[in-house]
């Protein structure tokens, strides 16, 4: 049992860091938008922005041996569409799970269901305000 979700963060190099949450599916876009908003001062530095967003998502569960995991260029157990944050392009996109070989992120379709501006994503799903 669980409510498994994966969150993909594209680094400046094009590689991806994937955050897996065993119980992270409920309100996943709102939680991600809040985390991305907290990282807004560092959106121009994918390493820092990803660290801030991941820290916000994991919150107080850093000491737990279960519940959260980090992967590189692959998703794991999944029950939802997959959100992708691209810091360099400042975009948010949503992808389907796809186990076909040849995908950039193993287990996720290369083709987005839709893409939107990262600021617009935060404004739509978060209570946080974006600094201008």
Which residues are covered by each model-predicted region?
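Low-complexity intrinsically disordered segments
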Residues: 36-132
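A broadly conserved detector of short glycine/acidic/proline-rich loop/turn motifs that flank catalytic sites
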Residues: 13, 24, 98
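Short, solvent-exposed aromatic-acidic interface loops
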Residues: 17-30
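Cysteine protease-like catalytic core of ubiquitin/ubiquitin-like
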Residues: 29-37
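Short acidic-glycine loop/turn motifs at beta-strand connectors
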Residues: 10-15, 87-89
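Short beta-strand scaffold segments in enzyme catalytic cores
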Residues: 4-9
């Amino acid at each position: 049992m669980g409510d498994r979700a994966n969150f993909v963060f594209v680094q400046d190099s094009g590689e991806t860091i994937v955050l897996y949450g065993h119980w992270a599916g409920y309100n996943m876009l709102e939680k991600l938008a809040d985390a991305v908003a907290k990282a807004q001062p560092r959106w121009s530095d994918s390493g820092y922005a990803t660290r801030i967003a991941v820290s916000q998502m994991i919150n107080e569960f850093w000491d737990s041996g279960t519940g959260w995991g980090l992967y590189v260029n692959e998703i794991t157990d999944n029950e939802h569409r997959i959100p992708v944050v691209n810091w360099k392009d400042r975009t948010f996109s949503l992808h389907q799970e796809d186990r076909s070989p040849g995908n950039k992120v193993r287990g996720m379709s290369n083709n987005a269901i839709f893409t939107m501006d990262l600021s617009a994503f935060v404004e739509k799903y978060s209570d946080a305000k974006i600094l201008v």
